[in-house]
Amino acid sequence: MKIIDKKIEQFAQYLQRKNNLDHIQFLKIRLGMQVLAINIEKSIVVYGLAIIFHTFFYTLLTHLSYFLIRRHAHGTHANSSLLCHIQNIIFFIIFPYLIIKLDINYFVLLSMALVGLIITILYAPAATKKQPIPRRLVKRKKILSIFLYCTIVVISLVTKEPVNKLILFGVILESLTLLPIFFPKEDINHGKHF
Protein backbone atom coordinates (compact mmCIF):
# COMPACT_ATOMS: atom_id res chain seq x y z
CA MET A 1 0.00 0.00 0.00
CA LYS A 2 2.98 2.31 0.54
CA ILE A 3 3.72 2.22 -3.19
CA ILE A 4 0.16 3.32 -3.94
CA ASP A 5 0.36 6.08 -1.30
CA LYS A 6 3.61 7.29 -2.85
CA LYS A 7 2.06 7.36 -6.34
CA ILE A 8 -1.00 9.20 -5.02
CA GLU A 9 1.25 11.76 -3.35
CA GLN A 10 3.25 12.25 -6.56
CA PHE A 11 0.14 12.59 -8.71
CA ALA A 12 -1.49 15.03 -6.26
CA GLN A 13 1.69 17.14 -6.28
CA TYR A 14 1.70 17.05 -10.08
CA LEU A 15 -1.93 18.24 -10.16
CA GLN A 16 -1.11 20.94 -7.62
CA ARG A 17 1.73 22.29 -9.77
CA LYS A 18 -0.14 21.98 -13.06
CA ASN A 19 -3.36 23.60 -11.79
CA ASN A 20 -1.80 26.06 -9.33
CA LEU A 21 -3.73 24.62 -6.36
CA ASP A 22 -3.31 25.88 -2.82
CA HIS A 23 -2.40 23.51 0.03
CA ILE A 24 -6.03 22.89 1.08
CA GLN A 25 -7.03 21.97 -2.48
CA PHE A 26 -3.99 19.69 -2.69
CA LEU A 27 -5.02 17.94 0.55
CA LYS A 28 -8.60 17.48 -0.69
CA ILE A 29 -7.41 15.96 -3.97
CA ARG A 30 -4.96 13.66 -2.18
CA LEU A 31 -7.63 12.56 0.31
CA GLY A 32 -10.10 11.87 -2.50
CA MET A 33 -7.57 9.70 -4.33
CA GLN A 34 -6.68 7.86 -1.09
CA VAL A 35 -10.36 7.15 -0.36
CA LEU A 36 -10.85 5.90 -3.93
CA ALA A 37 -7.80 3.61 -3.68
CA ILE A 38 -8.95 2.21 -0.32
CA ASN A 39 -12.48 1.56 -1.63
CA ILE A 40 -11.14 -0.18 -4.74
CA GLU A 41 -8.89 -2.34 -2.57
CA LYS A 42 -11.78 -3.26 -0.22
CA SER A 43 -14.01 -4.10 -3.19
CA ILE A 44 -11.34 -6.33 -4.71
CA VAL A 45 -10.95 -8.20 -1.42
CA VAL A 46 -14.69 -8.64 -0.74
CA TYR A 47 -15.74 -9.50 -4.28
CA GLY A 48 -12.64 -11.63 -4.84
CA LEU A 49 -13.54 -13.70 -1.78
CA ALA A 50 -17.19 -13.76 -2.86
CA ILE A 51 -16.13 -15.25 -6.20
CA ILE A 52 -13.87 -17.80 -4.50
CA PHE A 53 -16.65 -18.87 -2.11
CA HIS A 54 -19.37 -18.77 -4.80
CA THR A 55 -21.36 -16.04 -3.04
CA PHE A 56 -20.87 -13.23 -5.57
CA PHE A 57 -24.60 -12.89 -6.32
CA TYR A 58 -25.50 -12.92 -2.61
CA THR A 59 -22.81 -10.37 -1.81
CA LEU A 60 -23.77 -8.11 -4.70
CA LEU A 61 -27.49 -7.99 -3.85
CA THR A 62 -26.86 -7.37 -0.16
CA HIS A 63 -24.25 -4.73 -0.90
CA LEU A 64 -26.42 -2.89 -3.45
CA SER A 65 -29.39 -2.47 -1.12
CA TYR A 66 -27.05 -1.53 1.74
CA PHE A 67 -25.28 1.08 -0.37
CA LEU A 68 -28.48 2.62 -1.76
CA ILE A 69 -29.55 3.52 1.77
CA ARG A 70 -26.07 4.29 3.11
CA ARG A 71 -25.45 6.88 0.41
CA HIS A 72 -28.08 9.09 2.02
CA ALA A 73 -28.40 7.77 5.59
CA HIS A 74 -24.65 7.56 6.30
CA GLY A 75 -23.86 5.74 9.57
CA THR A 76 -20.94 4.58 11.65
CA HIS A 77 -17.68 3.23 10.25
CA ALA A 78 -15.24 0.59 11.44
CA ASN A 79 -12.42 1.92 13.61
CA SER A 80 -9.65 0.54 11.40
CA SER A 81 -9.10 -0.78 7.91
CA LEU A 82 -8.53 -4.31 9.23
CA LEU A 83 -11.78 -4.21 11.22
CA CYS A 84 -13.55 -2.92 8.11
CA HIS A 85 -12.27 -5.89 6.08
CA ILE A 86 -13.37 -8.32 8.80
CA GLN A 87 -16.82 -6.74 9.04
CA ASN A 88 -17.21 -6.71 5.25
CA ILE A 89 -16.37 -10.41 5.05
CA ILE A 90 -18.78 -11.28 7.87
CA PHE A 91 -21.66 -9.02 6.79
CA PHE A 92 -21.43 -9.28 3.01
CA ILE A 93 -20.13 -12.82 2.45
CA ILE A 94 -20.83 -15.03 5.48
CA PHE A 95 -24.22 -13.66 6.64
CA PRO A 96 -25.85 -13.63 3.18
CA TYR A 97 -24.62 -17.19 2.65
CA LEU A 98 -26.07 -18.26 6.01
CA ILE A 99 -29.39 -16.50 5.36
CA ILE A 100 -29.84 -18.55 2.19
CA LYS A 101 -28.37 -21.85 3.38
CA LEU A 102 -30.25 -21.80 6.71
CA ASP A 103 -33.37 -20.70 4.84
CA ILE A 104 -34.14 -17.82 7.19
CA ASN A 105 -37.84 -17.07 6.88
CA TYR A 106 -38.67 -14.07 4.71
CA PHE A 107 -41.20 -12.76 7.23
CA VAL A 108 -38.57 -12.76 9.98
CA LEU A 109 -36.40 -10.57 7.76
CA LEU A 110 -39.39 -8.41 6.81
CA SER A 111 -40.19 -7.86 10.51
CA MET A 112 -36.58 -6.90 11.14
CA ALA A 113 -36.68 -4.58 8.13
CA LEU A 114 -39.72 -2.80 9.56
CA VAL A 115 -37.82 -2.24 12.81
CA GLY A 116 -34.94 -0.99 10.63
CA LEU A 117 -37.34 1.46 8.97
CA ILE A 118 -38.19 2.91 12.38
CA ILE A 119 -34.46 3.22 13.13
CA THR A 120 -33.95 4.96 9.79
CA ILE A 121 -36.82 7.37 10.46
CA LEU A 122 -35.39 8.21 13.90
CA TYR A 123 -31.67 8.45 13.14
CA ALA A 124 -31.02 9.06 9.44
CA PRO A 125 -28.92 10.76 8.34
CA ALA A 126 -26.30 9.95 10.98
CA ALA A 127 -23.41 12.38 10.92
CA THR A 128 -20.00 11.47 12.25
CA LYS A 129 -17.01 13.56 13.26
CA LYS A 130 -15.19 12.56 10.08
CA GLN A 131 -18.29 12.85 7.90
CA PRO A 132 -20.39 15.77 9.06
CA ILE A 133 -23.52 16.53 7.07
CA PRO A 134 -24.22 20.15 6.13
CA ARG A 135 -27.48 21.31 7.72
CA ARG A 136 -28.91 22.23 4.31
CA LEU A 137 -28.71 18.56 3.20
CA VAL A 138 -30.15 16.90 6.31
CA LYS A 139 -33.86 17.04 5.39
CA ARG A 140 -33.22 15.90 1.81
CA LYS A 141 -31.04 12.99 2.95
CA LYS A 142 -33.61 11.93 5.55
CA ILE A 143 -36.44 11.94 3.00
CA LEU A 144 -34.34 10.03 0.43
CA SER A 145 -33.23 7.49 3.06
CA ILE A 146 -36.81 6.76 4.10
CA PHE A 147 -38.11 6.73 0.52
CA LEU A 148 -35.39 4.34 -0.71
CA TYR A 149 -35.80 2.12 2.34
CA CYS A 150 -39.57 1.83 1.72
CA THR A 151 -38.98 1.25 -1.99
CA ILE A 152 -36.56 -1.60 -1.30
CA VAL A 153 -38.98 -3.19 1.18
CA VAL A 154 -41.79 -3.00 -1.42
CA ILE A 155 -39.47 -4.49 -4.06
CA SER A 156 -38.77 -7.36 -1.65
CA LEU A 157 -42.52 -8.06 -1.50
CA VAL A 158 -42.71 -8.65 -5.26
CA THR A 159 -39.41 -10.46 -5.87
CA LYS A 160 -38.65 -14.11 -5.39
CA GLU A 161 -36.22 -15.82 -3.06
CA PRO A 162 -33.29 -15.40 -2.53
CA VAL A 163 -33.37 -11.85 -3.94
CA ASN A 164 -36.02 -10.63 -1.50
CA LYS A 165 -34.14 -11.95 1.53
CA LEU A 166 -30.79 -10.53 0.47
CA ILE A 167 -32.04 -7.03 -0.30
CA LEU A 168 -33.88 -6.94 3.02
CA PHE A 169 -30.73 -8.00 4.84
CA GLY A 170 -28.81 -5.15 3.19
CA VAL A 171 -31.23 -2.49 4.43
CA ILE A 172 -31.42 -4.08 7.89
CA LEU A 173 -27.64 -3.99 8.10
CA GLU A 174 -27.48 -0.33 7.08
CA SER A 175 -30.17 0.66 9.58
CA LEU A 176 -28.10 -0.87 12.38
CA THR A 177 -25.16 1.39 11.49
CA LEU A 178 -27.37 4.37 12.34
CA LEU A 179 -27.87 3.37 15.98
CA PRO A 180 -26.06 5.67 18.42
CA ILE A 181 -24.76 2.68 20.43
CA PHE A 182 -22.38 1.87 17.56
CA PHE A 183 -20.82 5.32 17.47
CA PRO A 184 -17.56 5.80 19.39
CA LYS A 185 -17.90 7.82 22.60
CA GLU A 186 -15.39 10.36 21.32
CA ASP A 187 -17.54 10.93 18.24
CA ILE A 188 -19.48 13.71 19.92
CA ASN A 189 -20.87 15.00 16.63
CA HIS A 190 -23.22 12.07 16.07
CA GLY A 191 -26.58 13.48 15.15
CA LYS A 192 -25.27 17.03 14.91
CA HIS A 193 -25.17 18.65 11.54
CA PHE A 194 -23.05 21.57 10.39
UniProtKB/Swiss-Prot annotation:
User: Quick one: a GO cellular component term?
Assistant: plasma membrane
This protein's source sits in the domain of life called Bacteria
The EC number on file is 3.4.-.-
Q: How does it sit in the membrane?
A: Multi-pass membrane protein
Indicate yes or no for the key word Transferase.
no
InterPro entries cross-referenced by the UniProt entry: AgrB (IPR006741)
Does the entry feature the keyword Electron transport, yes or no?
no
Q: What does this protein do?
A: Essential for the production of a quorum sensing system signal molecule, the autoinducing peptide (AIP). This quorum sensing system is responsible for the regulation of the expression of virulence factor genes. Involved in the proteolytic processing of AgrD, the precursor of AIP.
Q: What is this protein called?
A: Accessory gene regulator protein B
